[in-house]
Structures are given as C-alpha cells and as structure tokens.
C-alpha cells in the first residue's frame, strides 16, 4: 500500500517519486489487491520479490513462488522481469526507472534470487541491452545443425548450462 501511495504522487502532487520496495516473493499474493488497484490507478513503483522460483523448495510448498510470474505477466500497468545476472538487472533497472517516469509508462516487478550465480564477463552491446529489456536473447546462437533450444529465465541459468553441456556430451 505504501508503494502504491508513493507511486501516485504525480497525480496527487504534480511531482513523481520513484519508490522501490521489496517483498517476500512467495507471499506476493497476500498484497495482490493493493498491487492490482495501484496498477489500475497508474501508480508508478518498482517492486522486488525475492527469492524467485523454487529456490526455497526444502522449506516446503508455501515457500515456492511458482504462480507469481503469472501476476507480472497478466497485470496491466506493470512490466515483469526475472533476470539471472547482475548485468541484466542493471540494464532492466536503468530502463525501468526511465519507464516509470514516462507518460505511457508503468510499474516494474522484478523477481530476483538470493542464490549465488557465477556472473558472466561480457560486453553489453546496445543490441544485447535491447534484447534483455525485450525479454529474450541468445546466450549462444544456434548453428546450422541445431536440434534443440533450451529457454530459461532467472536463477536456473547454471542448471540449464549444465544440462546443455550434458546433452552435448551425450550426443
């Protein structure tokens, strides 16, 4: 509710604030009415949910945020992202803070992890930045003999890379 109230500052006081808040992602549904109404009122905020996905599986089913991606995908007025790497997060946050200020912009929902991942060392080209914001990019472009493409998002990146290596060796 506080994010929604601060996110309405432009329509109430003529000055836009850029509030950023955190939430325990598995329990985002507990504040879903406030999130929905905030988006319907064109409130602008960035909400960060951690930990995303099933990274807390040992703690039981209530601690797995399996359905929360659907909230970000289906709620009008909010853009949802689940980056795997910090360079992606940097690109998304920079874009998101700009998007929140645009007349036709909206809010941002980031689903992040607390699980450590090895970070890539790569050149962030303009094309890569655009692809990150648009939701997908090739980690490795498929060659002419490609038989399988594995798509992923978020914290499972290292597991996907391991699976791809295993499949390549098994072939």
Describe every region a protein language model picked out.
Residues 2-149:
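Conserved thiamine diphosphate
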Residues 152-171:
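Redox- and metal-dependent alpha/beta enzyme cores, enriched for Fe-S-associated oxidoreductases
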